[in-house]
Regions:
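P-loop NTP-binding/switch modules centered on Walker-like glycine-rich loops
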Residues: 1-67, 338, 342-421
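Conserved ABC ATPase "signature" region
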Residues: 57, 286-303, 412
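Charged, flexible cofactor/metal-binding loops and thiol motifs
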Residues: 41-148, 161, 165, 395-483
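Helix-to-loop junction immediately C-terminal to a conserved catalytic motif
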Residues: 213
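Conserved ABC ATPase signature
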Residues: 308-312, 316
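ABC ATPase NBD coupling module
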Residues: 43-48, 77-83, 230-252, 266, ...
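Conserved catalytic motifs of ABC-family nucleotide-binding domains
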Residues: 329
């Protein structure tokens, strides 16, 4: 809107192809430092004529897919190491001898695009071929699985901190002000289940993960955890310093930014040695063999052991962070926006890896993401949070179809698809709130389905649909279906 109103030009750099589809008139696709495709947004995103652009689009999870997308094989060449031929040749299904010996020039097509490819005319067939999809790890036995984690009335608050607050507390002994961020979370998670937490920024998703990891202490409620598959859950200490080795091993957190968990001064060998030595007492040859085995599981070779984090790409760092977490052989892995900083091809590879490890180890995941398509593809159940309160819980397929909570409807309507012809369904004059109302429904002020004073005065009841689908709303499920 600003560009249209002011007439200014804009260069927009992003991994988010959905945002590109909404903002840009033209798109340039770059690979190994070169422009490989340039055209109108519609041309590039709907009928890409370069194999790399085609692979990028095929790597994006979509709300319409029930499975994970296939990741691009291989990795980009190191800077200055592209060779004499096409930089993408080693990863390209169309590559021929000429691709490996002769670098393609950027040429103009009859439709006005510019493309760097010897075989761009053959990509029409690739565009008409359905994308390869990966089956998500089967969880047919979840109905019989025992709970591994139970949250009972979990509430978390942050202390309000500011200059006036500190002065008041010191001079007058006034009470500290706490702002509630997570309120009365009741949730049972089964062993081997993947539960996705979704909601806008400030909804409490990451706060819940930090509390489960022992980095934030709740102000109310309890967390029960089963470490030995016995079905006998015990109280989980609220702070990490109070937890024993078994709890520390069993619960691992993968951060959004892998640099938060990788010591820049340590080699990958030293990073992996920490959990392997601490929890299993491995040394010497046994330590080396286990480290190599773990790296191979995340599709990195033994030669990575001598490298520092600064010598890795973003995707490789995240794979090492995942390897470090799984080195402890955890029962529960907390994934906090683990793919948000990655390009779509690396994201697809990381999601496939998490799915593969879940299938191999029966690991339980709590997966936090803003990307609703990623959550749908990877999760067995989804929890929708608004201002720290649960408003919908249910099987992934059920939450993404009707009936749904009005807030879930707003979230799904705002999804940006990588299609310039697909416009998001935004609520008119919608303004994100900084805090929930004092009483009534947390979503009352923004709700496009608000029905009156009852929304302002009374906390909505939980309504139960099929297969354990729960919606917290004053509107009946039958009416939500009609809406």
């Amino acid at each position: 809107d600003l560009a249209a109103e002011t007439g200014m030009a804009m260069v927009y750099v992003s991994h988010d192809l959905g945002a590109i589809a909404r903002v840009c008139d033209r798109v340039m696709v770059m690979y190994a430092g070169e422009i490989v495709l340039e055209g109108t947004t519609s041309q590039v995103l709907k009928t890409p004529i370069h194999p790399y652009a085609h692979g990028l689009l095929a790597s994006i999870p979509k709300l319409s897919d029930a499975q994970l997308p296939q990741a691009l094989d291989g990795r980009p060449p190191a800077p200055g190491d592209a060779g004499a031929g096409c930089a993408f040749a080693d990863r390209c299904a169309l590559a021929s001898d000429v691709c490996r010996t002769e670098r393609p020039v950027l040429q103009k097509t009859p439709n006005g695009e510019h493309v760097r490819c010897h075989h761009f005319t053959d990509i029409v067939q690739m565009n008409s071929t359905s994308a390869l999809l990966i089956d998500v790890a089967q969880t047919d036995t979840l109905s019989k699985a025992l709970p591994i984690l139970t949250l009972g009335g979990l509430s978390i608050s942050y202390q309000q901190k500011g200059l006036l607050d500190d002065l008041s507390a010191r001079l007058f002994g006034s009470e500290k002000i706490f702002i509630p961020t997570v309120d009365d979370i009741e949730l049972e998670i089964k062993r081997g289940e993947t539960v996705g937490l979704v909601g806008e920024s400030g909804s409490g998703k990451s706060t819940i993960l930090k509390s489960l990891a022992g980095l934030l202490s709740p102000v109310a409620g309890e967390v029960l955890f089963d470490t030995d598959s016995s079905g006998q859950s015990g109280q989980l200490p609220s702070i990490v310093e109070a937890r024993g080795h078994e709890h520390l091993r069993a619960i691992q957190l993968i951060f959004q930014n892998p640099d938060d968990s990788l010591n820049p001064r340590h080699t990958i060998a030293e990073i992996l040695a920490q959990p392997l030595t601490l929890y299993f007492g491995l040394t010497d040859d046994a330590l080396y063999e286990r480290s190599v085995s773990i790296l191979e599981r995340v599709r990195l070779g033994a030669h990575y052991l001598a490298r520092l984090p600064s010598q890795l790409s973003g995707g490789e760092k995240q794979r090492v962070a995942i390897a470090r977490a799984f080195a402890a052989e955890p029962d529960l892995v907390l994934c906090d926006e683990v793919t948000s900083a990655l390009d779509v091809s690396v994201q697809a590879a990381v999601l496939a890896l998490l799915n593969e490890l879940k299938h191999e180890k029966g690991t339980t995941y709590i997966f936090v993401s803003h990307d609703l398509a990623v959550v749908k593809a990877l999760s067995d159940r989804v929890v929708v949070l608004y201002q720290g309160r649960m408003c919908e819980v249910g099987p992934s397929d059920a939450v993404y179809s009707q009936p749904s909570h009005p807030y879930t409807e707003v979230l799904l309507g705002a999804v940006l698809e990588p299609d310039p012809d697909s416009a998001p369904k935004l609520v008119a004059d919608d303004i994100v709130e900084l805090s929930p109302p004092a009483k009534g429904c947390a979503f009352q002020r923004r709700c496009p389905r608000r029905i009156g004073a009852i929304c302002d005065e009374m906390v909505p009841p939980w309504q139960r649909g099929a297969d354990g689908h729960l919606i917290r709303c004053h509107i009946s499920l039958d009416e939500l279906i009609r809406l």
